[in-house]
């Protein structure tokens, strides 16, 4: 089985991308990166990401993929498509917004696979004094200015070598507070109970707003784009800290191990 995700054949991956190979390896299934495709490979699974749109499906189809398996992927931007025109199985999509935009059957489960990380990689928090700034990969600029505004102690680069993911995951989970505008940094913080806020400064890109709606509607938390650490801490304490998240075991239970 092939697995397609952004930068899947690179040594350095975006933070959220690491979740795809980690979960696949956790289940011990036989899989390869899409970049290793041979003419005999005709099936592909899509897990973490916001690329569930027409261009992705069509490009994969043109490369010889005939059967698609979706477990957690969500709609971000791009054109919608009629799923009935493809041989495509939906085991899990990211949220209700994705289901609505693609007009998918209501019985398809929802949830982002990132939320199962504490189940497959348990970490006992040992809180450090680090206040981390972990911006989206497109917002990793003007760090000196941002440090003055946000008063963080440590910068967390979301572009991480494959062999450093678990080390960086521990750093994130053990931090005192996280300031971010990366969706999967936010998801991991929620999943592990790490205090965090979503902060967007002037000039920073708000990447794929619909993906944020997908996730935060699923959790039931009112998203706020904060402009300072103090505003973010207040949002965390009032909106997030005591808010329960849906049971994530059901996400793990939907994994289609039988297709491998």
What are these regions (language model features)?
Residues 1-260:
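Active-site anion-handling motifs in enzyme catalytic cores
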């Amino acid at each position: 089985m092939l697995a397609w995700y952004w930068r899947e054949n690179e040594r350095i991956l975006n933070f959220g991308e690491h979740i795809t190979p980690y979960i696949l390896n956790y289940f011990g299934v036989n899989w390869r990166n899409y970049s290793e495709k041979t003419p005999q490979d005709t099936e592909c699974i899509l897990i973490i990401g916001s690329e569930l749109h027409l261009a992705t499906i069509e490009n994969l189809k043109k490369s010889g993929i005939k059967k698609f398996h979706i477990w957690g992927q969500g709609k971000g931007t791009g054109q919608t498509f009629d799923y009935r025109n493809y041989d495509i199985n939906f085991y899990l999509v990211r949220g209700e917004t994705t289901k609505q935009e693609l007009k998918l059957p209501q019985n398809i489960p929802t949830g982002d696979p990132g939320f199962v990380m504490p189940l497959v990689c348990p970490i006992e928090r040992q809180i450090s004094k680090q206040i981390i700034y972990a911006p989206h990969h497109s917002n990793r600029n003007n760090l000196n200015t941002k440090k003055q505004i946000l008063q963080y102690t440590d910068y967390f680069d979301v572009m991480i070598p494959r062999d450093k993911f678990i080390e960086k995951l521990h750093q994130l989970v053990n931090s005192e507070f996280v300031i971010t505008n990366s969706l999967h940094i936010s998801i991991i913080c929620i999943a592990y109970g790490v205090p965090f806020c979503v902060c967007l400064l002037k000039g920073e890109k708000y990447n794929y707003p619909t993906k944020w709606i997908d996730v935060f509607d699923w959790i039931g938390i009112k998203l706020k784009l904060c402009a300072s650490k103090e505003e973010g801490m207040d949002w965390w304490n009032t909106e997030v800290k005591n808010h329960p998240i849906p049971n994530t075991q059901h996400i793990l239970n939907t994994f289609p191990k039988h297709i491998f």
